């Protein structure tokens, strides 16, 4: 059977949001099955649907794919968003990993223990401003093109846009000294599929607030 | 210029060892420039050689590739150890990510604060025995083949062998109830390139003891 991919995850961004973004940018419609209780998760495990007892899991082309990177790589390859040869893929992979590292750092802030929050927030801001954003500003400056790799849209442009939106939510002033990244953000945001995903009513997920996290923590005991 | 890949990292396993393993299994000779002082690391950064100011970094085919997964993907593609099509690659990626997750968990034990060590060791043992090894035993059982994916050697067989050797060092009893994994370990270990890498005098790195870690911690302030 083929048909739409089915995404299994919580009703939250977490480690699924980059997959939603990539599918949306590729113009692929998808269904979501939300895990709303520990029993839902237990059932997925018991039925042998989760290779390592974890989500994200995506049903696609007859497979039950787990692991964020495996899912992203498959979608990027299938929809030709992964460069034209292995050298372009190497750049795309290197940039993607940097983006995932910083995204993870920022995401972790919402679930980090209160006594560590200040130090971790300061570190995340420092890394954003002094390590990651300068690296990507430099890439754009080096070739002067509209996209990061190969002068056309690839997965990494979508990953970077997603990150820039999180950085903006986190502390918009962090973007001030990166004119090329700001232009990149508007440019990618205006691509038709992306524009659609950015509009209200799409399957994009909103940030969770402290109260929602408390509730999720009680239900899923993390 | 081409020539041998040059690996930049500390004289330790860390996040470079899986790259050493993959190159060795592919029969590729490589050079290592070991980082022996904070000044060595500072120089690499200052010269603009590290995209995100981090190692591992590998000079290969004119690129200065950072990020473990980007490096592994490039080597696996170049030396045809990445499956025959995108569905095989999806399995290889999913399995590889599970292996990297458990490897990271075991590696982190040596540098974790003493007061957390007991709990983290127990968790790592539990995950090894009840999550990861059963998942791979099941894959081997499901198809009865010698290799994990596509009935021939791929990167993921090398990653799994490396993990099984770490598990054995960690607590050999964890392997007892997995006969197919034990047979897999002997089988992959006897492949000529792998056998050579397993012999003393190769570029494989030994486990560090507590004293070496203390010294590294002082020098590199982690």
UniProtKB/Swiss-Prot annotation, chain A:
Residues annotated as binding glutathione are 9, 45, 54-55, 67-68
Question: Which parts of the sequence belong to the GST C-terminal domain?
Answer: 85-208
Record EC number? 2.5.1.18, 1.11.1.-, 5.3.3.-
Q: Where in the cell is it found?
A: Cytoplasm
Record-level GO BP terms: epithelial cell differentiation; glutathione derivative biosynthetic process; glutathione metabolic process; linoleic acid metabolic process; prostaglandin metabolic process; response to nutrient levels; response to xenobiotic stimulus; xenobiotic catabolic process
**Where does the GST N-terminal domain start and stop, copy by copy?**
3-83
Reaction(s) the record says it catalyses: RX + glutathione = an S-substituted glutathione + a halide anion + H(+); prostaglandin A2 + glutathione = prostaglandin A2-S-(R)-glutathione; prostaglandin J2 + glutathione = prostaglandin J2-S-(R)-glutathione; (13S)-hydroperoxy-(9Z,11E)-octadecadienoate + 2 glutathione = (13S)-hydroxy-(9Z,11E)-octadecadienoate + glutathione disulfide + H2O
Q: Which GO terms describe its cellular component?
A: cytosol
The entry lists its GO molecular-function terms as:
dinitrosyl-iron complex binding; fatty acid binding; glutathione binding; glutathione peroxidase activity; glutathione transferase activity; protein homodimerization activity; steroid Delta-isomerase activity
Residues annotated as carrying N-acetylmethionine in the record are: 1
Identify the keywords attached in UniProt to this record, alphabetized. Acetylation, Cytoplasm, Isomerase, Lipid metabolism, Oxidoreductase, Peroxidase, Transferase
Q: Which residues form a coiled coil?
A: none
Q: Keyword Ribosomal protein: yes or no? A: no
Residues with the modification N6-succinyllysine, per the entry, are 4
Does the keyword Transferase feature in the UniProt annotation? yes
Which Pfam family is one of this chain's hits? GST_N
Name where it mostly resides: cytoplasm
Tell me the subunit arrangement: Homodimer. Homodimer or heterodimer of GSTA1 and GSTA2.
The record describes the protein's role as:
Glutathione S-transferase that catalyzes the nucleophilic attack of the sulfur atom of glutathione on the electrophilic groups of a wide range of exogenous and endogenous compounds. Involved in the formation of glutathione conjugates of both prostaglandin A2 (PGA2) and prostaglandin J2 (PGJ2). It also catalyzes the isomerization of D5-androstene-3,17-dione (AD) into D4-androstene-3,17-dione and may therefore play an important role in hormone biosynthesis.
UniProt record similarity statement: Belongs to the GST superfamily. Alpha family.
* Anything else known: In addition to its enzymatic activity, the homodimer of Ya chains, called ligandin, binds various organic anions, xenobiotics, and azocarcinogen dyes.
Q: What is this protein called?
A: Glutathione S-transferase alpha-1
Organism source for this protein?
Answer: Rattus norvegicus
Q: Which lineage is the organism of this entry classified under, starting from the top rank? A: Eukaryota, Metazoa, Chordata, Craniata, Vertebrata
Curated annotation (Swiss-Prot), chain B:
Give all residue intervals belonging to the GST N-terminal domain. Answer: 3-83
Per the record, the GO terms for biological process are: epithelial cell differentiation; glutathione metabolic process; response to bacterium; response to stilbenoid; xenobiotic catabolic process; xenobiotic metabolic process
Q: Name one GO molecular function term.
A: dinitrosyl-iron complex binding
Task: List GO terms (cellular component aspect).
Answer: cytosol; mitochondrion
Q: Which residues bind glutathione?
A: 9, 45, 54-55, 67-68
EC number(s)? 2.5.1.18
Ordered alphabetically, the record's keywords are:
Cytoplasm, Transferase
InterPro entries per the record? Answer: Glutathione-S-Trfase_C-like, Glutathione-S-Trfase_C_sf, Glutathione_S-Trfase_N, GST_alpha, GST_C, GST_superfamily, Thioredoxin-like_sf
**Localization in the cell:** Cytoplasm
Q: Which residues form the signal peptide?
A: none
GST C-terminal domain location: 85-208
N6-succinyllysine: modified positions: 4
Catalysed reaction, written as an equation = RX + glutathione = an S-substituted glutathione + a halide anion + H(+)
Q: Which Pfam families match?
A: GST_C, GST_N
Q: How does it assemble?
A: Homodimer or heterodimer of GSTA1 and GSTA2.
- Function, in words: Catalyzes the conjugation of glutathione to a large variety of electrophilic compounds.
Family (UniProt): Belongs to the GST superfamily. Alpha family.
Print the miscellaneous field.
In addition to its enzymatic activity, the homodimer of Ya chains, called ligandin, binds various organic anions, xenobiotics, and azocarcinogen dyes.
Name of the protein = Glutathione S-transferase alpha-2
- Species per Swiss-Prot/TrEMBL record: Rattus norvegicus
